Amino acid sequence: MTFYILMNQITTMFLGLNLLTTISFDSEIVSYMYGGSKQEIFFQVTNNNRTLAIKPLMEGDFSNLLVITKEHKYYFDLKLTDKNSHQFIEVKNGIASHALSKKVKTKDYEILEGQASILFINNTNKEMMVNNIIVKQREYFSKGVPIILNGKRILN
């Protein structure tokens, strides 16, 4: 799975308790920082410093993760799940796409997908919380990442 991550957006990553998750980057990992304790999650940098392996060691609520590569910084919110966890993630840089096609349409919202981002359109008169960002009308988001609307995972 490929995540096209837009600058300064927090990406939610779902981890499985008995599953190794790898995140591969285009450039070398310089450092990473986890906000929780070492007893919660195992981390190891591999593959010529371009891949970070992650494995939860216990159940619970996890903290956030910052990964700094030679070219960019990436912010992750780590969550434990027993279904649809991420395994192999390739991280690319996202950009706001303008050639878009419809991916999801409901009476309340639409999700349009481009080559390196998605556009979330709010069709209501009320604000929506999407990936911890308030969307009044429309907002670009990283492509490939989970889309969480008002606390519920609706895509990826």
Regions found by a protein language model. Give the residues of each.
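A general "mature secreted/periplasmic domain" signal
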Residues: 1-156
